[in-house]
Amino acid sequence: MLHVVPLEWTVEEVVPYLERLAVWLRASVLVAFQLTATVALSVLSWWLMPPPVAELCERGRDDDPPSLSHLSLVVPVGCLFLLLRGPSIDRCPRKLPLLLAYCLPHALAFLTLLMCQPSPQAFVGAALLALAVDLSCLGASLLGCDPGASLRRLWLPSVLSLLCATALGLWLLRAAAPFFLGLHATTLLTVTLMLIHDLSLITCQSSFPESFQPSLRLYVENVALFIGMYHLLRLWLWSP
């Protein structure tokens, strides 16, 4: 049947699918870069840490001092203020510094996990959760120049993010005792907003809230959700 169809029509029909494939491959490469840079920055920071500080962390990790948990709030807030005045990924001519800025909050969270309980298991669950959430964040940034196309093409990662947020929300609701009341409430509120946002993307193909840029809004949700996820992972992986 192929010889009956004109070649130009065949190419025109195939090109949109190739463009979509190229977009998702590009997003996958950026996600892989982000995860690799995150783990590398965390491990490098741990190895370069002065011995007295490392001994102090190892000595205090059983007590789980609150100061270590609160460290994961510092860099995300700083990056957020920087990105509030800066361009998004799709408009930034030099994308490497901005991508590294996206990695910093996750690198600090990884480092917090290492400081509290150094173990390779910290990377496994966090990387799996990161893959689902970061696809939404980076996909929206990459396709932010065309909001309509962005929302349509983000259907699959939005479903993955919705499943991830639903599981986290159910875990939070069933938790016997909040690990930290303020963080527990913030994470639960963020998950609720994430659920509303993902349902809006999937059902209505409209963004929520409309006044926020897609990349900035998803970055805020991403950072807040990551903070809660890492703390939950720490409790789940090393609970007695």
UniProtKB/Swiss-Prot annotation:
Membrane topology: Multi-pass membrane protein
Keyword ATP-binding applies: no
Chief location category: host cell
Keywords noted in UniProt: Host membrane, Late protein, Membrane, Transmembrane, Transmembrane helix
Residue stretches in coiled coil: none
Superkingdom, natural source: Viruses
Keyword Transmembrane helix applies: yes
GO cellular component: host cell membrane; membrane
Residues spanning the membrane: 29-49, 64-84, 96-116, 123-143, 153-173, 176-196, 218-238
Subcellular location: Host membrane
Family: Belongs to the cytomegalovirus US12 family.
Name used for this protein in its record: Transmembrane protein US19
Species lineage: Viruses, Duplodnaviria, Heunggongvirae, Peploviricota, Herviviricetes
